């Protein structure tokens, strides 16, 4: 299955860590790690919060599902 989110890439581009993101969102670091490895996906509200923290559009956090 194709990775749905680009969270790990955006964290690197923004020079932030998954621990930082977990603290900002009040989430467990394991949860954020699962998002970064695409084992789990954040809900739309959380994606919107993440986009706001990074100053990007939600679509910048997602990979296209088109082939």
Functional labels for PLM-detected ranges:
Residues 27-42:
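Recognition helix of helix-turn-helix/homeodomain-like DNA-binding domains
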Residues 45-60:
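DNA major-groove recognition helix of helix-turn-helix/homeodomain DNA-binding modules
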Residues 36, 54, 62-65:
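DNA major-groove recognition helix of helix-turn-helix
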Residues 18, 29, 44-47:
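Helix-turn-helix DNA-binding elements, focusing on the entry/boundary residues of the two helices
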Residues 21-22:
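Short alpha-helical "recognition helix" segments of helix-turn-helix
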Residues 38, 49, 67:
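Alpha-helical DNA-recognition elements
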Residues 1-17:
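A short, Lys/Arg-rich alpha-helix, primarily the initiator
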């Amino acid at each position: 299955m194709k990775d749905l989110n680009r969270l790990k890439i955006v964290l690197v581009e923004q020079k932030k860590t998954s621990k930082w993101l977990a603290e900002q969102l009040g989430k467990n670091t394991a949860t954020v790690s699962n998002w970064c490895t695409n084992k789990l996906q954040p809900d739309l509200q959380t994606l919107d919060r993440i986009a706001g923290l990074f100053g990007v559009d939600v679509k910048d956090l997602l990979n296209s599902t088109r082939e």
